[in-house]
Regions:
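Conserved AMP-binding/adenylate-forming
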Residues: 3-20, 24-114, 121-123, 136-137, ...
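AMP-binding/adenylate-forming catalytic core of the ANL superfamily
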Residues: 77, 82-83, 92, 97, ...
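Active-site/pore-lining binding-face segments in mid-to-C-terminal subdomains
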Residues: 198, 204, 213-218
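Short, internal active-site loops enriched in acidic
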Residues: 156, 202-206
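Solvent-exposed beta-strand sheet faces enriched in polar/charged residues
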Residues: 20, 54, 117, 152, ...
Length: 278
């Protein structure tokens, strides 16, 4: 829950909101915040549970992160489930000594408050519905006009994310976005996973070892979505972003006319990533 949206909800409905963090595998809660909490925090660990922020190499913990440094969130406690039915899923879910890998990124402060900064796993989460990017990439990569595709979450102020994909086309191809979406719709059984948008790109951003670097794609589409939103509402401002070590993706909006700042804040308050307006 973004802090601006939290404040807006409290003001509109005259009711206090406490932020929290959890997932199905933890029987709802991992942490919850008292009504007085630092902005952006999802609270402290619930009683009898443990939270650990680490760097991972596969399933091996290489380092416990110091305060303020972002890493993978591990959780252990009586609220954590016993495991998945599928052994294949279990093999990737557990780290040493019963620690469950949430797949989320976050950090803690000196007072024990937890902050979410991103996601380590590539899942697209559409209003609580988990979508495996592979469901989208498999039919796209099988198309003769596609060299490679990468599915990521399209920022959405209502559902959090919608499925989308970046695609590198074959040389000379004139395939359109609508045609590829129609191809996915006919090839995919999971309706909620059909991409809502496809962006064409000359080449995928790669890591030093040649793997597709999804954070750059997320950064790119986030800027695009916000720029389109501002254009639609006739707000003239500059949009930029950066990937911070602690907070993850941070979007910056600057140069907005003073009489439109209030409208701008209302427009972007539903997004879950950090937005700074100057």
């Amino acid at each position: 829950l973004s802090h601006p949206f939290e404040l807006s909800f409290e003001k509109k409905h005259d009711v206090a909101v406490g932020n929290g963090y959890g997932m199905t595998e933890t029987t709802a809660l991992i942490s919850r915040a008292p009504l007085e909490q630092p902005p952006g925090s999802v609270g402290m660990r619930i009683p009898y549970s443990e939270i650990r922020i680490v760097h991972l190499d596969g399933l091996e913990v290489t380092q416990d992160c110091p305060l303020g440094e972002s890493g993978v969130i591990l959780v252990r406690g009586p609220q954590v489930f016993q495991g998945y039915k599928s052994e294949a899923d279990n093999a990737l879910a557990w780290v040493e000594d019963g620690w469950f890998n949430t797949g989320d990124l976050g950090y803690t402060d000196a007072d024990g408050y937890l902050y979410i900064s991103g996601r380590a796993k590539d899942l697209i989460i559409r209003g609580g519905h988990n979508i495996d990017p592979g469901l989208i990439e498999e039919p796209l990569n099988a198309h003769p006009d596609v060299v490679v595709s990468t599915a990521i979450g399209l920022p959405d102020s209502y559902t959090g994310e919608l499925p989308m994909a970046y695609v590198v086309k074959t040389v000379g191809s004139n395939i359109s976005e609508d045609e590829l979406i129609a191809h996915c719709r006919s090839a995919m059984s999971e309706r909620a996973a059909v991409p809502k948008r496809i962006e064409f790109i000359e080449a995928m951003p790669l890591t030093a070892v040649g793997k597709i670097f999804r954070p750059t794609l997320r950064q790119r589409i986030t800027e695009t979505v916000i720029k389109e939103l501002l254009l639609e509402h006739h707000i003239d401002a500059q949009v930029s972003s950066e990937l911070e070590k602690q907070r993850g993706l941070v979007l910056n909006i600057s140069g907005c006319e003073s009489d439109k700042v209030s409208s701008l804040k209302q427009l972007v308050e539903g997004f879950t990533f950090t937005i700074e307006i100057s």
